[in-house]
């Protein structure tokens, strides 16, 4: 049986129970530049490598703020990430206006997954070709979620997505017992994230132009560092 008999849409299962279009969407994540997320009990951090198409273009935005307590980083198709981040921003505003409370981070992940899952079960759409790392802080503490276009969301202490992300993942696994205990010291958590992302680099080095950092936590609203603000972490 040929694979191309079953990969023309997202609603046809292969004889082995696979949805090939969804698997192809997961592969799109690996085309994006690497981004790292990690958290302790009090803070969560995103560290992302930005790319530019050529020497005459600006660097692509990799980290997006959704609310004062939440934001995300992307790997994959940036237009798809823009749609999802706008949706999440609307849900954050709705929660604040209607219920007078911040949207819980876990709830935000579930809302995104429900939106993504619809594109795996109906004609006329395609799966989102982007992976997201979502960080936030709510009454239950700091959170790090990984969103996949298959409709899965996972809460983690640390992970990396994008091209050559395995090096960063291996570093985080090796230092897990160290960085999860970094409470009340966000600079040390950021440095751990920068060291992790450097493990995924080959022919390039981190600079103030291609590095983007975000942090959120206890008494710390979601803040993005770009340009000279990241120099002290390199």
Curated annotation (Swiss-Prot):
UniProt cross-references to PROSITE patterns, sorted A to Z: PROTEASOME_ALPHA_1, PROTEASOME_ALPHA_2
Compartments where found: Cytoplasm; Nucleus
Keyword Phosphoprotein belongs to the record: yes
Coarse class of the protein's main subcellular location: cytoplasm
Modification Phosphoserine, positions: 14
GO cellular component: nucleus; proteasome complex; proteasome core complex, alpha-subunit complex; proteasome storage granule
Entry annotated with the keyword Ribosomal protein: no
Crosslink position(s): Glycyl lysine isopeptide (Lys-Gly) (interchain with G-Cter in ubiquitin): 191
Transmembrane segments: none
Record's keyword terms, sorted: Cytoplasm, Isopeptide bond, Nucleus, Phosphoprotein, Proteasome, Ubl conjugation
BP GO terms, sorted: proteasomal ubiquitin-independent protein catabolic process; proteasome-mediated ubiquitin-dependent protein catabolic process
Miscellaneous: Present with 7210 molecules/cell in log phase SD medium.
Subunit description: The 26S proteasome consists of a 20S proteasome core and two 19S regulatory subunits. The 20S proteasome core is composed of 28 subunits that are arranged in four stacked rings, resulting in a barrel-shaped structure. The two end rings are each formed by seven alpha subunits, and the two central rings are each formed by seven beta subunits. The catalytic chamber with the active sites is on the inside of the barrel.
PANTHER family: PROTEASOME SUBUNIT ALPHA/BETA
Similarity field: Belongs to the peptidase T1A family.
Function description: The proteasome degrades poly-ubiquitinated proteins in the cytoplasm and in the nucleus. It is essential for the regulated turnover of proteins and for the removal of misfolded proteins. The proteasome is a multicatalytic proteinase complex that is characterized by its ability to cleave peptides with Arg, Phe, Tyr, Leu, and Glu adjacent to the leaving group at neutral or slightly basic pH. It has an ATP-dependent proteolytic activity.
Protein name: Proteasome subunit alpha type-6
Organism name: Saccharomyces cerevisiae (strain ATCC 204508 / S288c) (Baker's yeast)
Gene: PRE5
């Amino acid at each position: 049986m040929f694979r191309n008999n079953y990969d023309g849409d997202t609603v046809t299962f292969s004889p082995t129970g696979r949805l090939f279009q969804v698997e192809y969407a997961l592969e799109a994540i690996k085309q994006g530049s690497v981004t790292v997320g990690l958290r302790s009990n009090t803070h969560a951090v995103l560290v992302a490598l930005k790319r530019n198409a050529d020497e005459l273009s600006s660097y692509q935005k990799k980290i997006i703020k959704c609310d004062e307590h939440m934001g995300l980083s992307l790997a994959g198709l940036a237009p798809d990430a823009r749609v999802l981040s706008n949706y999440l921003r609307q849900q954050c505003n709705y929660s604040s206006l209607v219920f007078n409370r911040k949207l819980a981070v876990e709830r935000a992940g579930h809302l995104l997954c429900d939106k993504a899952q619809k594109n795996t079960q109906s004609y006329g759409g395609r799966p989102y070709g982007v992976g997201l790392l979502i960080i936030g802080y709510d009454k239950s503490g700091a959170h790090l979620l990984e969103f996949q276009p298959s409709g899965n969301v996972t809460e983690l202490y640390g992970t990396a997505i994008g091209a050559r992300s395995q090096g960063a993942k291996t570093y985080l696994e090796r230092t897990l017992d160290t960085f999860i205990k970094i409470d009340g010291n966000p600079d040390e958590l950021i440095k751990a994230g920068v060291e992790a992302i450097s493990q995924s680099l080959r022919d390039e080095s981190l600079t103030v132009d291609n590095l983007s950092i975000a942090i959120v936590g206890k008494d710390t609203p979601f803040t993005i560092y770009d340009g000279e603000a990241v120099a002290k972490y390199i």
